[in-house]
Amino acid sequence: MIPATKNTKDTKKMDATADNVPSLCDAIRQTAYDLHVYLGVGYLEKVYENALCHRLEKRGMSVRRQVPIRVSDMDGYPIGEYIADVIVENMILELKATSTLTDAHVAQTLNYLKATGLKHAMLINFGSETFQCRKLAL
């Protein structure tokens, strides 16, 4: 499992626990939506990642970018590695800048959850004219 990081801000820590997952999702979703309205479509995924992380950090959230996730065989032998776009308060954020979300994007995000042991993720697409955001859980 990926170790948690400390929140260095003097604000209340929002961790992705059963009690506050809805409020954490709402805060992330609203921040991402506001960013989508501000920037619109057409930028590379990295631009949206940088801007979203900046805005979430300003809200006092613990944000980690480009987090390596090891995939192991049943016996623990490492067989591959993913890179998660962003982890906020133990919730994976998988960001896209494509015309629409696909089943493959959902499967990728669910695999990140399986590989990390984390329970919650959000799949956010900035590339569509209509804002797309899906909450996923195991």
Placement of each model-derived feature along the sequence:
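Short, low-complexity, charge-dense intrinsically disordered segments
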Residues: M1-D19
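Nucleic-acid nuclease catalytic cores
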Residues: I92, K96-L138
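Nuclease catalytic cores
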Residues: V21-D26, Q30, V41-E45, E49, ...
